[in-house]
Amino acid sequence: GNNITVVIQNNIDVPGNFEVITMFEGNKVDKQLGKTIADLKSNSYVDFKGTGDLKTTAGLVLKGGDDGAVTNQAYTDYLGTIEPYEFHTIGIPTKDASIKAVATTFIKRLKEDGRQVQLVLENYPEADSENVISVKNGVVLSDGTLITSDKVVAFITGATAGANVNQSNTYLEYPGAIDVDKKYTNREIEEALLNGEMLFSVSNNRVVIEQDINTFKSFTSDKGKDYRKNRVVRILFEVNNGIRLLWETNYIGKGDNSVDGRNLFKKDVIKFLEKLQGIEALENVIPEDVEVIKGTDKDSVVARVEVQPIDAMEKLYMTVEVR
């Protein structure tokens, strides 16, 4: 409540009425008209009560408020609210294992529905999914502020959501940070990475993300260790989401499910993949790697797409010869 300000000003269109504006951290979140306090309706930030006429004020800063207790149901409601919207990354800054489990189940269900998004949590490597990122430690800012692992989720979420499809966040610097809150030895760092844990380390006096990875670690012959790298995953997500958008925008309900119609869709898919190759997200794109055939139903189409993602250079093996 301490970040809420209420501004009351005269309404120029309706004489005698006032505009009551609720501001949160400097942003307008609610606006309504009224003559008296009784005319006002409560909103998500302020519960208006009382009687009497309204009076102008440049800004009444509310005091004594608190955030209240966040319940598991609040997180469940949040996930239900955002599900209908398109998004690429969400972060849940909590240490509660039960909430992490609920969020992970939610993200995995979206994956089963064909939506490829990523979730950022702290210390939850057991998710074992390319759709879930787990952050192990936090950072210390130059003014001494401690950003713990649950709070640093916000930075990782922003960095992940803002990364280009052909960009890795490995060694991405945390602006303003001078140290990490928990230091690890090289062996401990290696073990954490193998366990699917993203962490911060200090390199050349910079606090950086040691490696841009997710929690996937149950490798198989069909799904290898490349899936643990977030740049590779972003590329695969872009292929999935981009082709889906292409289909929904230009073909579903519009194109004929004939040889010519499917070939037209195939050509557009190839063009899309070639664009990704042009920005060095993919390599070796050839038409033979894209197959579009008629499905079992008369209105269904089956697409098979083979791609080769390009990862960033992260490992250097060097031999120095002395002569």
Protein language model regions, located:
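C-terminal edge-of-domain segments
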Residues: E291-R323
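C-terminal structured domain segments
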Residues: N257-K298
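A glycine- and small-residue-enriched flexible loop/hinge signal that marks low-structured segments
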Residues: G1-D256, D260, F265, K275-Q277
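Composition- and surface-driven signal marking solvent-exposed, interaction-prone regions
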Residues: A103-F106, E288, M318-E321
